[in-house]
Regions:
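An alpha-helical, amphipathic repeat domain used for nucleic-acid recognition
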Residues: 1-249
Length: 249
């Protein structure tokens, strides 16, 4: 078999025409490695080698495009390639090559991920650490890089979230409001000792003004359907759910 023509395609590929009417789609890397010039003779053994190396290039460039679209951990990238049903040996080879070239690096990934989460979310350190662990980042790397999220920054973030919680839940009583904010911060991944040290700076006393306003609002809502002791019972239940208590003068 002899090469009679080339046609440049997209994404670094070429269509190679042979004199037996066969056409090959090969990466430029393959053409350069095997010095595939016009009129070059190809035997079946070489054809097998070309196909194997072309597959290798395909896995590598698919992996490279994947991390160019979004930086990934080694585990994430490997799972991505396995889902595409590439042979495991070629996947491992591509990943090793990317590691050697510096395109893959779990420490750099962890650092970038943590910075991004700090800037774009309200997540606490434990939640971020859990997400990195799910991406199979080494625990030593996680523990070292999470130091980027300083206690000072966490404290300021907790204060911001407490203020927001107070503002958006202004119709709740002090005890219920404090517990809700505490639970929200814990779920967000903040350290409970740090939460307690910050939250104790705030006053969460029951506010009689809030209770009165809520009572009047509930009265207007339910007095159209209930009256007397039944109406009072329903209003008291609703107030209790909000951590409020109000006795009419």
């Amino acid at each position: 078999m002899k090469i009679i023509k080339y046609k440049k395609g997209s994404k670094g590929k070429y269509k190679v025409f042979l004199d037996d009417d066969r056409e090959l789609i090969l990466y430029e890397d393959v053409i350069l490695k095997y010095n595939l010039l016009l009129s070059k003779e190809l035997d079946e053994k070489t054809m097998i080698e070309l196909d194997k190396y072309n597959q290798e290039c395909d896995v590598y460039y698919t992996a490279l495009n994947s991390i160019n679209n979004r930086f990934k951990s080694v585990y994430e990238l490997k799972q991505n390639l396995i889902k595409k049903e590439y042979p495991k040996d070629l996947v491992d080879k591509a990943i090793d090559k990317l590691l050697q070239q510096g395109y893959l690096n779990d420490r750099i990934f962890a650092k970038s991920y943590i910075n991004n989460q700090i800037i774009t979310t309200n997540k606490g350190p434990y939640k971020i650490m859990k997400e990195l662990a799910d991406k199979k980042i080494d625990s030593d790397i996680i523990n070292e890089e999470i130091e980027l999220f300083t206690v000072e920054e966490q404290t300021e973030r907790i204060k911001k979230l407490i203020n927001k919680g107070i503002k958006t839940n202004h119709n709740r009583g002090g005890i219920v409001l404090k517990q809700k904010i505490y639970n929200d911060l814990k779920l967000a991944g903040y350290d409970i000792n740090l939460i307690n040290s910050v939250i104790c700076e705030y006053s969460f006393e029951n506010d009689s003004v809030i209770a009165k306003k809520e009572y009047e609002k509930l009265y207007r809502k339910y007095s159209r359907k209930y009256s007397g002791s039944e109406l009072e019972r329903i209003i008291k239940e609703k107030l209790y759910q909000k951590g409020l208590k109000y006795e009419k003068e």
